[in-house]
C-alpha cells in the first residue's frame, strides 16, 4: 500500500513537471477581449525582421542604425556632443595575492558618476594581452560589488557565492581582466529616486519615466555607459581587443544583448536568463518595465538582436526552473537565431543551453563556451 502511494505521488509529480514545461501550455492567458486587443496592437511592422534573401551586411547596418535611434542612443550622442568622460580612481586593493581590484568612477555624462571595478590578475607579465570580460548586473542594488566579489558582509558573500554570482571575480581568477560596472537605475550608487512612490516605489521604473519624457530609454543610458567604459578600457595595452567578452544575468543580460547588437567590439556575448522574445505568443511582456523600448515591435524582436550579433560568438543561457521566462518562447527565439547563424555558415559560433536551476549564472555552461570561443579567435 505504501509502495502504491509512493508510485502515485511520483506519477503526479512527473505529470506536474511535464505540464510545467509543456510546449502546448501558454505561459500566461488573458481574457479573450484583452487577448484580441494585445494581438492587434503588438503585432508590429517588424520592419527590420531578418530576411535571408536580402544583403546581410546592409541589413545589419540599417537595422543597427534604426535601433540606435529608437532606443534614444542617438539622442544621447547628440545631446552630449563634445562631452569628454572623466575617470577617477577611488580605491585599489590586492585580494589574496591573486588579483588587484580597483574601484573607479567614470562620469559618462555631466553629473553622472558610474562606479566600476577593474580586476587584473596579479604577477602577470605586463606585455601579455588578456581577454576582457565586461559584466553589467541586473536588479541588485549591490550588483557591481556582487559581481566583483567585493562583498558588503558575510551574508552578502554567502548569498552571491550560493548562486555563482561573482562572475567578474571568476573571470580574473581564470587569468582574464574583468570589469564589473554599476548598471544605471539598478545599482544603489546610480538610482533615480521615486519620491512619494509615484512609480510603485521602483527606482528602475522612475528611471524609465524620466527617460521617456526626455526622448531616451534606460537601455540607451546603460548602453552608453558600457560604451564609455569600453572606450577607456581599450586604451589599456594589456587588453586583447579581439577578445572582448560581455555577460550579465537578468537585466544585465538584456543590457548585454543590446550592447552586443549595437557595438561590434563585443566579440563573445553571453546573455544569461534574459534573451527571449519581447512578448509571449499571448502578449505577455517578459522583461522589466525599465527594459521597454517604445515602438520596438515595429523594429523587430530579440530574434533580430541575435541577427545583429551574428556571426560573432553568442551563448544564450536560461534556467529551466526560471519562472520569469517561458521555455517555448525562449526556444522559438533561439531557433530563429540558430537559423540566422546557419545562413551565415556560423552554426558553431552560436549555442543555446538550459541550466538545471533558476534565475542565475551557470558557470559550468558559460566558461567552456568562453574558452572555446577564445581558442577559436586566437587561431
Residue ranges of model-derived segments:
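Cap/lid segment of the alpha/beta-hydrolase catalytic domain
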Residues: 128, 134-227, 235, 280-285
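Gly/Ala-rich beta-loop-alpha elbow adjacent to hydrolase catalytic centers
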Residues: 248-252, 256
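N-terminal pre-domain segments of enzymes
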Residues: 23-69
Amino acid at each position: 500500500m505504501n509502495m502504491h502511494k509512493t508510485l502515485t505521488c511520483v506519477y503526479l509529480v512527473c505529470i506536474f513537471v511535464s505540464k510545467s514545461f509543456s510546449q502546448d501550455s501558454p505561459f500566461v492567458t488573458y481574457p479573450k477581449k484583452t487577448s484580441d486587443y494585445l494581438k492587434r496592437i503588438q503585432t508590429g511592422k517588424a520592419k527590420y525582421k531578418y530576411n535571408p534573401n536580402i544583403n546581410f551586411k546592409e541589413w545589419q547596418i540599417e537595422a543597427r542604425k534604426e535601433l540606435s535611434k529608437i532606443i534614444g542612443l542617438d539622442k544621447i550622442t547628440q545631446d552630449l556632443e563634445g562631452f569628454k568622460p572623466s575617470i577617477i580612481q577611488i580605491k585599489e586593493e590586492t585580494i589574496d595575492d591573486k588579483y588587484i581590484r580597483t574601484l573607479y568612477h567614470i562620469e559618462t555624462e555631466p553629473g553622472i558618476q558610474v562606479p566600476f571595478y577593474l580586476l587584473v590578475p596579479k604577477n602577470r607579465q605586463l606585455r601579455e594581452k588578456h581577454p576582457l570580460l565586461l559584466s553589467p548586473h541586473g536588479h541588485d542594488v549591490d550588483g557591481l560589488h556582487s559581481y566583483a566579489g567585493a562583498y558588503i558582509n558575510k551574508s552578502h558573500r554567502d548569498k552571491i557565492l550560493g548562486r555563482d554570482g561573482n562572475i567578474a571575480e571568476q573571470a580574473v581568477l581564470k587569468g582574464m581582466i574583468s570589469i564589473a560596472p554599476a548598471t544605471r537605475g539598478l545599482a544603489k550608487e546610480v538610482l533615480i529616486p521615486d519620491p512619494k512612490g509615484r512609480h510603485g516605489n521602483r527606482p528602475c521604473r522612475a528611471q524609465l519615466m524620466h527617460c521617456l519624457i526626455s526622448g531616451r530609454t534606460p537601455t540607451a543610458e546603460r548602453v552608453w555607459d558600457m560604451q564609455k567604459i569600453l572606450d577607456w578600457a581599450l586604451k589599456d595595452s594589456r587588453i586583447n581587443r579581439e577578445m572582448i567578452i560581455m555577460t550579465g544575468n537578468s537585466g544585465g543580460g538584456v543590457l548585454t544583448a543590446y550592447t552586443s547588437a549595437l557595438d561590434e567590439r563585443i566579440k563573445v556575448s553571453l546573455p544569461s536568463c534574459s534573451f527571449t522574445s519581447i512578448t509571449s505568443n499571448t502578449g505577455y511582456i517578459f522583461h522589466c518595465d525599465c527594459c521597454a523600448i517604445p515602438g520596438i515591435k515595429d523594429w523587430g524582436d530579440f530574434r533580430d538582436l541575435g541577427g545583429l550579433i551574428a556571426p560573432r560568438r553568442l551563448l544564450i543561457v536560461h534556467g529551466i526552473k526560471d519562472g520569469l521566462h517561458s521555455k517555448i518562447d525562449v526556444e522559438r527565439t533561439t531557433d530563429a537565431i540558430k537559423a540566422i547563424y546557419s545562413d551565415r555558415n556560423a552554426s558553431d559560433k552560436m549555442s543555446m543551453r538550459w541550466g538545471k536551476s533558476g534565475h542565475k549564472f551557470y558557470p559550468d555552461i558559460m566558461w567552456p563556451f568562453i574558452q572555446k570561443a577564445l581558442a577559436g579567435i586566437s587561431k
